[in-house]
């Protein structure tokens, strides 16, 4: 998940920056935010809440400025549970940026189920890597 295609070169990032959209309730529009250099859940949670509060009323699509190039797109559709989701990014030439999308969780029996979809470019990520991602995600969710 750490690769990008920049100036006809394949680049491997040492670190990824999670970028996510938030919803302006008043305008009905989304805007992009991101979290940098955070290493533990508490700092991520604290910074996420601070960003959401500080930019709640923005009308700018990228109120923090220029989006870093080393991003992984995190997307959420909390209004619905899904079995598959596809976001077409064909208009962005040579886009190999991964996108992880989660949906509304549901309780089924004694289990809490949350759909998670990952979109990757096969030139940089193989099924093996996707399976590692889901293995780690499941382990963390079980904690």
Regions found by a protein language model. Name each.
Residues 1-18:
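Hydrophobic "lid/gating" helix adjacent to the active-site nucleophile
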Residues 16-23, 87:
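Short amphipathic alpha-helices and their capping loops
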Residues 24-79:
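Helical lid/core segments from catalytic subdomains that handle acyl or acyl-like groups
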Residues 62, 69-76, 80-113:
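Flexible, Gly/Pro-enriched loop and linker segments at secondary-structure and domain junctions
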Residues 1-4, 35, 42, 54, ...:
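Active-site-proximal acidic secondary-structure segment that organizes catalysis
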Residues 63-84, 123-142:
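Short flexible/disordered coil segments
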Residues 16, 29-31, 114-116:
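Short amphipathic alpha-helical segments
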């Amino acid at each position: 998940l750490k690769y990008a295609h920049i100036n006809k070169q394949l680049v491997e990032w040492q670190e990824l920056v999670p970028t996510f959209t938030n919803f302006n309730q008043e305008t009905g529009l989304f805007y992009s935010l991101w979290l940098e250099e955070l290493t533990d859940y508490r700092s991520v949670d604290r910074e996420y809440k601070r960003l959401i509060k500080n930019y709640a009323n923005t009308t700018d699509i990228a109120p923090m400025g220029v989006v870093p190039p080393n991003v992984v797109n995190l997307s959420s559709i909390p209004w619905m549970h899904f079995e598959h989701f596809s976001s077409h990014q064909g208009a962005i030439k040579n886009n190999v940026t991964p996108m992880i999308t989660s949906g509304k969780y549901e309780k089924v029996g004694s289990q809490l189920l949350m759909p998670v979809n990952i979109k990757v470019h096969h030139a940089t990520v193989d099924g093996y890597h996707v399976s590692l991602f889901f293995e780690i995600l499941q382990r963390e969710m079980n904690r």
